[in-house]
Regions:
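Small-residue-rich segments of transmembrane alpha-helices in multi-pass membrane proteins
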Residues: 28-38, 60-63, 84-97, 138-143
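Juxtamembrane membrane-interface segments at transmembrane alpha-helix termini
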Residues: 36-44, 67-71, 92-102, 115-127
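Alpha-helical transmembrane-segment detector that highlights a single hydrophobic TM helix
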Residues: 47-70
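Alpha-helical transmembrane segments of multi-pass membrane proteins, especially transporters
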Residues: 21, 25-33, 52-60, 81, ...
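Alpha-helical transmembrane segments and their membrane-interface boundaries
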Residues: 1-54, 101, 121, 139-144
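Short glycine-rich loop/turn motifs that provide flexible caps or phosphate-binding loops at active sites
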Residues: 6, 10, 21, 31, ...
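Canonical alpha-helical transmembrane segment with a positive-inside/aromatic-interface signature
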Residues: 100-144
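Membrane-helix interface "capping/anchor" motifs
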Residues: 16-21, 70-82
Length: 144
């Protein structure tokens, strides 16, 4: 339940901004990662199960989900923040699965703060072409 709730918090921000990986996606990624991690810790399995190998496979699987969210349109690359959010949602689920509840809650708060508060700062200082110097040459302005 904790992993699901943490995924919902991150997914809520993504959903609010209209990104494709929203509430359901982030909640499922966090809950699934927690479940796989927790299953690896059950001592009753007939074979020896290494939880770190399960964690590595979670990271690999989530990498495919993240890669699917990244789109390139000309020189514009979209979806990197969503891909990173998917990656973090999985790590939060794994942290909860390993029993690091407070770490997962703390990181979730930090992630939501970064997603919500840095967007206006980034747009103001780094993406506004109106504030660039006239002598700055952009790649699309170079002579052919």
């Amino acid at each position: 339940m904790i992993a699901l709730a943490l995924g919902l918090l991150i997914g809520g921000e993504r959903e609010f901004r209209g990104h494709p990986a929203g509430l359901r996606t982030m909640a499922l990624i966090s809950a699934g990662s927690c479940m796989f991690t927790g299953l690896g810790l059950i001592p009753e399995f007939p074979q020896n199960v290494d939880p770190t190998r399960i964690a590595a496979q979670i990271v690999t699987g989530v990498g495919f989900l993240g890669a699917g969210s990244i789109l390139r349109q000309g020189e514009l690359v979209r979806g990197l923040t969503t891909a990173a959010s998917i990656w973090v949602a999985a790590s939060l689920g794994m942290a909860v699965g390993f029993g690091y509840y407070w770490l997962a809650v703390f990181v979730t708060v930090l992630v939501v703060v970064v997603l919500v508060s840095l967007k206006p700062f980034e747009e103001r200082f780094f993406r506004n072409r109106a504030h660039r110097r006239e002598t700055d040459v952009q790649p699309d302005e170079l002579p052919q």
